[in-house]
């Protein structure tokens, strides 16, 4: 053996590639377009059988039996993590709350719909400390019911049962959340490089007076909502009230729902800070192998029960923290409060001259009592004038408070599950709620011959290929796979606010809708405008493909309903407004983010892959669907014909590409210097990015003409049917 070698054996393989030690492509070229978000949940990571259907599995579940087991778990205290006052309800509610509470309306990402709390970064966020214990307590139930019950559904159901076990009549529960199998890559949690970074820190999520960066809702990296100690850890209830209002609004909650959720969430359970935070070990992702996925383990003792440390605040909000009552408002409104420090050194509010009967029995010793506590956010419910009015109303009418909370809790835990048609189980409420974006069911069928006849009428209506395709696209492109909102079903493109969105070219849109409405009225059979819009796009694509020499039938399944204005919450739908659309080569204005990055974000929300994005952009260009009829990226002399010309000319070395302005390029003939075409960044990225160029070259090949058409049709159909949950 070489004497210079260490006595420790060398690694038998080329190490580094499977760890964080190795540099990846984005480290070397940080400005490169990262396509990973389009391929994050493919079948390679999913261990389920190809034929596994979670909806069918859940529908075979004995939900009542699961709830009985959960009820039993609530009071079955385990020595390794004892229940506060013998009841796990507060812990389970916090777990469910923090699972759902990451949702934000701006992009629909986050939320409870995927079970993402099991993975980094959420499993190791400071605000999720000790929720790893809640999930381990649930493991015997998950193990028992197996694939019939996802982690995502179980976590929310556990929160629901916890409330019911403590006396709240909940509004209902729906299953249907399918688990993911590895961390999500598409969610932007902020650009800070440290947990709980204060406002003035580099890469702050705030600008101006206190403008929170879109699409974020939480005030700090690693928090679900607001800082419980106050803005940047400095107690000031009125400043905190501003943060609370912004955060909850970005979760689709109004002031009344905000007060109800704050009070209802703090009616039960407690904060944990009876110890020193520095005694805790790393979070789960930073722990050693022997910790087996647990984190925040106390290095100087058990650190459980009465001695647990989580947020650092210490105490319960109410006198009876294992029962649903109106005690939160009784204490908040009837006592004056003063700032104190918890044993862990956190700022919290405690009552002055509290009556003995209003104190809280100690978790560790039933013969001792302690003051209840309030966070800075709780004090905001008293100090902010609007929140105070609502708090007073809830205090005077406990039944009303319970009803508002139950509905708000249902909304919180189901907001990202999508429309009611996706709900599963026997406890789905009968009521249609406006935030569920209801759509009327249809009562007609169309056979193949009727569909052919309708296509002919649409093509003879006087509308062009580009008008039909663009309108169908605009109707469907609002779909978000994050929270299953938007899409062509409902034809809300006819209604406010969508009919007036700049992205939808209102003048052109009204022309098309007028023709379609007149056609609908002339039919002897009822057909929805939603179906006619989609069918018009299909007919136009078939015509364009035929003119390119390819015979193809675009799949079409009728069954879309037409929503009414009364079914449409204008404010709620405003967040779906497109501010950019690479597929139609448009953006409302220049943004800090590059157009191609915005294209990836929109593509991911629509559930498309990189090659589907590629073929759709190439097809939309030659079909002449650019916003306002611009010619950028229309690399063809046969506009309206579904050829692969976009890719043929993009990859042709007879041309040179030159910048000609902001997001504008000229395609110049190398020999003559003549300008042949113009293009935007989202056109040229398909020739610049090495991965996208590989797809572009494949579609530019001489043998790809038919494949291009068929791939375009497949991707198009995927977009048109993205919100057809009835077809699943």
UniProtKB/Swiss-Prot annotation:
Reported cofactor(s): heme b
Record function comment: Bifunctional enzyme with both catalase and broad-spectrum peroxidase activity.
InterPro entries associated with the record: Catalase_peroxidase, Haem_peroxidase, Haem_peroxidase_sf, Peroxidases_AS
Assembly and binders: Homodimer or homotetramer.
Modifications the protein undergoes after translation, according to the UniProt entry: Formation of the three residue Trp-Tyr-Met cross-link is important for the catalase, but not the peroxidase activity of the enzyme.
An annotated GO BP: cellular response to hydrogen peroxide
Pfam families per UniProt: peroxidase
Source species taxonomy: Bacteria, Pseudomonadati, Pseudomonadota, Gammaproteobacteria, Alteromonadales
Active-site positions on this chain: 98
Catalytic function, reaction form: H2O2 + AH2 = A + 2 H2O; 2 H2O2 = O2 + 2 H2O
EC number: 1.11.1.21
Keyword DNA-binding belongs to the record: no
EC primary class: oxidoreductase
UniProt KW keywords: Heme, Hydrogen peroxide, Iron, Metal-binding, Oxidoreductase, Peroxidase, Signal
CDD domains with a match to the protein in the record: catalase_peroxidase_1 (cd00649), catalase_peroxidase_2 (cd08200)
Site (Transition state stabilizer): 94
KW Transport (keyword) present: no
Molecular function terms, GO-annotated: catalase activity; heme binding; metal ion binding
Cofactor descriptive note: Binds 1 heme b (iron(II)-protoporphyrin IX) group per dimer.
Similarity section: Belongs to the peroxidase family. Peroxidase/catalase subfamily.
Chain residues that bind heme b: 266
Protein name as annotated: Catalase-peroxidase 1
Signal peptide: 1-22
One of the record's GO cellular component terms: cytosol
Placement of covalent cross-link Tryptophyl-tyrosyl-methioninium (Trp-Tyr) (with M-251): 97-225
Site of covalent link Tryptophyl-tyrosyl-methioninium (Tyr-Met) (with W-97): 225-251
SUPFAM superfamilies reported for this sequence: Heme-dependent peroxidases (SSF48113)
């Amino acid at each position: 053996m070489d004497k210079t070698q260490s006595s420790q054996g060398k690694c038998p393989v080329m190490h580094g590639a499977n760890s964080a030690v190795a540099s990846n492509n984005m480290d070397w070229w940080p400005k490169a377009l990262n396509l990973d978000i389009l391929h994050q949940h493919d079948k390679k990571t999913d261990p389920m059988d190809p034929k596994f259907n979670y909806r069918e599995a859940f529908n075979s579940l004995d939900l009542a039996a699961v709830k009985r087991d959960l009820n039993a778990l609530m009071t079955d205290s385990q020595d390794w993590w004892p229940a506060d006052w013998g009841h796990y309800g507060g812990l389970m509610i916090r777990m469910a709350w923090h699972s759902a509470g990451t949702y934000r309306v701006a992009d629909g990402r986050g939320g409870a719909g995927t079970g993402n709390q099991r993975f980094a970064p959420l499993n190791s966020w400071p605000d999720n400390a000790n929720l790893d214990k809640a999930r381990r307590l649930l493991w015997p139930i998950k193990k028992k019911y197996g694939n019939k019950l996802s982690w995502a559904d179980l976590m929310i159901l556990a929160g629901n049962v916890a409330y019911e076990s403590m006396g709240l009549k909940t509004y209902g529960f729906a299953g249907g959340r399918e688990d993911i199998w590895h961390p999500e890559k598409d969610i932007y949690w902020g650009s800070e490089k440290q947990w709980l970074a204060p406002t003035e820190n580099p890469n702050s999520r705030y600008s101006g007076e206190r403008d929170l960066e879109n699409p974020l809702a939480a005030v700090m990296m690693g928090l679900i909502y607001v800082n419980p100690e106050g803005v940047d850890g400095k107690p000031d209830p009125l400043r905190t009230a501003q943060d609370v209002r912004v955060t909850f609004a970005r979760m689709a909650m109004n002031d009344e729902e905000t007060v109800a959720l704050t009070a209802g969430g703090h009616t039960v359970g407690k904060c944990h800070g009876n110890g020193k935070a520095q005694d805790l070990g790393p979070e789960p992702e930073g722990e050693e192998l022997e910790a087996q996925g647990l984190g925040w383990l106390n290095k100087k003792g058990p650190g459980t029960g009465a001695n647990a440390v989580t947020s650092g605040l210490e105490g319960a909000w109410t006198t009876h923290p294992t029962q649903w009552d109106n005690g939160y408002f009784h204490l908040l409104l009837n006592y004056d409060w003063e700032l104190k420090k918890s044993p862990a050194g956190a700022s919290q509010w405690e009552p002055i001259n509290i009556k003995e009967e209003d104190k809280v029995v100690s978790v560790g010793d039933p013969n001792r009592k302690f003051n209840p506590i309030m966070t800075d956010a709780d004090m905001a419910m008293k100090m902010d004038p609007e929140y105070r009015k609502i708090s007073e109303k809830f205090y005077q009418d406990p039944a009303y408070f319970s009803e508002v909370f139950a509905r708000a809790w249902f909304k919180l835990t189901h907001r990202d599950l999508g429309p009611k048609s996706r709900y599963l189980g026997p406890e789905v409420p009968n009521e249609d709620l406006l935030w569920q974006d209801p759509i009327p069911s249809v009562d007609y069928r169309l056979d193949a011959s009727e569909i052919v006849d309708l296509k002919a009428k649409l093509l003879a209506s006087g509308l062009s290929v580009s008008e039909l395709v663009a309108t169908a696209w605009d109707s469907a492109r609002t779909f978000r796979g994050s929270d299953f909102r938007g899409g062509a079903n409902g034809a809300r493109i006819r209604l406010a606010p969508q009919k007036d969105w700049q992205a939808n070219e209102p003048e052109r849109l009204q022309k098309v809708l007028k023709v379609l409405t007149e056609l609908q009225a002339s039919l002897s059979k009822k057909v929805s405008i939603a179906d006619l819009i989609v069918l018009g796009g299909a007919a136009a694509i078939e015509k364009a493909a035929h003119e390119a020499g390819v015979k193809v039938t675009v799949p079409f399944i009728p069954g879309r309903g037409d929503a009414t204005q009364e079914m449409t919450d204008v404010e709620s739908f405003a967040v779906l407004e497109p501010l950019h659309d690479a597929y139609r080569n448009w953006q409302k204005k220049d943004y800090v983010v590059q157009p191609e990055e915005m294209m990836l974000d929109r593509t991911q929300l629509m559930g498309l892959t990189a090659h589907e994005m590629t073929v759709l952009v190439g097809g939309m260009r030659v079909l002449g669907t650019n916003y306002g009829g611009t010619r950028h990226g229309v690399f063809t002399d046969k506009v309206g014909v579904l050829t692969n010309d976009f890719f043929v000319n993009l990859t042709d070395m007879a041309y040179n590409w030159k910048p000609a302005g902001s997001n504008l390029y000229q395609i110049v003939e190398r020999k003559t210097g003549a300008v042949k075409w113009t293009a935007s960044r989202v056109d040229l990225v398909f020739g610049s990015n090495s991965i996208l160029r590989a797809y572009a070259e494949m579609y530019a090949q001489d043998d790809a003409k038919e494949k291009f058409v068929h791939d375009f049709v497949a991707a198009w159909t995927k977009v048109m049917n993205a919100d057809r949950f009835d077809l699943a």
